[in-house]
Each structure stands twice: as structure tokens, then as C-alpha cells.
From Swiss-Prot:
Topology term for the membrane: Multi-pass membrane protein
Transmembrane regions listed in the UniProt entry: 1-21, 25-45, 59-81
Protein species of origin: Equus caballus
Subunit and partners: Core subunit of respiratory chain NADH dehydrogenase (Complex I) which is composed of 45 different subunits.
Any one Gene Ontology BP term: ATP synthesis coupled electron transport
Protein name: NADH-ubiquinone oxidoreductase chain 4L
PANTHER family xref list: NADH-UBIQUINONE OXIDOREDUCTASE CHAIN 4L, NADH-UBIQUINONE OXIDOREDUCTASE SUBUNIT ND4L
Enzyme Commission (EC) number: 7.1.1.2
Reaction catalysis annotation: a ubiquinone + NADH + 5 H(+)(in) = a ubiquinol + NAD(+) + 4 H(+)(out)
Entry-linked Gene3D superfamilies: 1.10.287.3510
Record localization: Mitochondrion inner membrane
Known role: Core subunit of the mitochondrial membrane respiratory chain NADH dehydrogenase (Complex I) which catalyzes electron transfer from NADH through the respiratory chain, using ubiquinone as an electron acceptor. Part of the enzyme membrane arm which is embedded in the lipid bilayer and involved in proton translocation.
Record-stated family: Belongs to the complex I subunit 4L family.
Length: 98
């Protein structure tokens, strides 16, 4: 395993630990999710380029599409919660249940 792979895996792990530890604000959770998706994108791109597997060449693009959808839903939820309650605490999301 090269140093680049270790650094990308470490970035994913740090983002995951940040997501698990700092769950008080929605914005910090969204930033940690974004870091995870970025490291997954880089890992998928490197895998496709290193293995020359042409059938999987669309996988990084599909991952970016899902990341954009996740980003849009997360930001719309952030705007809705902060307009309704005035703060972006994750604990306010429990009040949105039907």
C-alpha cells in the first residue's frame, strides 16, 4: 500500500471519527460527510485508473452525483431547521418526526 492510499484512507477515517464525535451541529456533520465522500471519490478514481477496469469508469461520476444529492438535501434540511428553530443543532431533527 502506497503512502497516497494511506493518506486517503486516513482522511476518510478522520472524517468518520469527526462525524461520530462532533454530532452537535448539523453543519459540522455535513462537512464531515463531505470529507468522507471526497475521499471515497479519490479512492474510486484511483482504483479505476490503477486497474484499467473500463466498465467501472462511471463509478466516480455516479458517486459525485450521489454526493451532490446528499449535499442538496443536507443543506435544505439545514436551512429549514435554522429558519424554524434559529439554531442548527442535530437534536432539533428529532422534533421533525411525524
Amino acid at each position: 500500500m502506497s503512502l497516497v492510499h494511506i493518506n486517503i484512507f486516513l482522511a476518510f477515517t478522520v472524517s468518520l471519527v469527526g462525524l461520530l464525535m462532533y454530532r452537535s451541529h448539523l453543519m459540522s456533520s455535513l462537512l464531515c460527510l463531505e470529507g468522507m465522500m471526497l475521499s471515497l471519490f479519490v479512492m474510486a478514481t484511483m482504483m479505476v485508473l490503477n486497474t484499467h477496469f473500463t466498465l467501472a469508469s462511471m463509478m466516480p461520476i455516479i458517486l459525485l452525483v450521489f454526493a451532490a444529492c446528499e449535499r442538496a438535501l443536507g443543506l435544505s434540511l439545514l436551512v429549514m431547521v435554522s429558519n424554524t428553530y434559529g439554531v442548527d443543532h442535530v437534536q432539533n431533527l428529532n422534533l421533525l418526526q411525524c
